């Protein structure tokens, strides 16, 4: 519905702005960003055009969401923060998005005090994987490391809360293991497969998600035109290859047999 209502807004903006104004329009559903050469262009040209366009459709600009900011101060869009650092444009996860995932993890761990470690992992892993996948195209490694540490703290507290006295030491031996000499204290638990064999499942680490820079689609490319068939087939193949590589990495690192975990005795 939002696509239908806002259809034509970009054309209307460019119709009334000069090429030298350097006006660009980016939209997803009912969220959009307009950039320009100066703040005056946005105030005196763009905002009046947008306001009039929306008014004709019985809508109005949200005063809460509408603001003019310099690119060096940055802005948030769809959970991303876009900002210029020392002359270089970088896109990172927004602070609000980071706070949101931390809250979700904290609440999930709190709900899971009565669960087994394997059950907690099965609920947390899709949350962790989904968030990390969403931000794998941007500058996210430092954020991934910060959140991995946050998840460790919450699962450590879960273990301490679940067990008391001397049993805490045994719980630490059970729930925190090592993948290698360089990757220790990974929250994990065992499950039994259909053959009754123990298989250890580990909490996913965001740092294991490979950063894959987005390759922009050619602006002139149209998937409905036959001359671009090969181009979109290549993009589709590249996407599948990236997904397969990530799947293999997940399988290797997050579902591990006993002998691959240091210090585990079957």
What do the PLM-derived regions correspond to, one by one?
Residues 1-266:
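Non-catalytic terminal/accessory segments
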